[in-house]
């Protein structure tokens, strides 16, 4: 992949939501390795601080910052926007909407509890993506801005109830934004991971038996790792992908059509 040395160009500003752990941290690390100005967002300040310190140590030529923000809360997103303008500057080059997650609710839960769960899943995975785009859209570089949304294999394969619905919504939003923003020189794409180890997503639900079963259904015969997703995002944010928009890059080792 062709890259331009940061000594020969202005460092880009890259915002990564859910940037403190797993896939988000790997994505941030890929851009930090290029010497970019990387901003991590998340809900846990202590996790973000540790991640930023680690990434800064690994990439001393980068500038790694963090800001605590729940992207599903409009006031917090607006607060982040104001902080960004004050501390970083008026232009964002790359926005990676990675924040999200899944939780479960018992099938016999009261309707009010089920509704709260549904709104929480939609908020963290879909509404948060929309709010971040809405808030930062005036500041995205034109032309050359990049928006990359993290969806999931669940958007097409199912599984996870409201999580699947939310991630399918992320794809719909991606397609709509790509059409709207293309004339302004901004590309919008999605990455849909399959099973990715070394993340907080599966937690205790990823037993050795379940992992072995999933790997057996995956043509590449291995699980994914955060670096696999980071490489896909890094490509979509590069000059090599300047004519790629409205696309979904499936990074699942073939699990989508596994046999």
Spans of model-derived segments:
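Active-site helix of classical SDR
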Residues: 133, 166, 174
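Short C-terminal tail/terminal secondary-structure segment
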Residues: 2-6, 102, 234, 245-259
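Residue(s) in the substrate-gating loop at a strand-loop-helix junction
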Residues: 152
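Conserved glycine-rich cofactor-binding loop
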Residues: 18-22
